[in-house]
Amino acid sequence: MAPKPNSDVTTKRWWEEYHRCRGVLVKQLRTEKGWTEAELAKRATVSIQWLRALEGNRLKSNHRMQHEMQVISALGFGTYEIKDFIGRVEDMVKETLGPPPWLKPAQADTSERPSK
């Protein structure tokens, strides 16, 4: 039995995929620029270990959002362009899982009803 569209399980799975895709996109953008992990870490003023954890989806829940923003900024996304980065991550997740479960309409009862 598949989880309901708006269940805690599907919401958790969506966010797990979001965080995975975020790391994939950071790594993709870094390699497109021809930068090593060390170079991006230096530009973003974060440790190489932290950057590796971001790219490998191994950040703990207490990671600092400031570090994440420093990395995104170092990749060329300004304050007003961060939504573009987030949009790209969301598009990657939608390709895998579809839209966020909290945006999916409730599953309608599709059983056929007898006609009168």
Mark where each language-model region is.
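The DNA-recognition helices of helix-turn-helix-type DNA-binding domains
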Residues: 47, 58-59, 89
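Short, basic-rich loop-to-helix N-cap that marks the start of a DNA-contacting helix
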Residues: 34, 42, 57-73
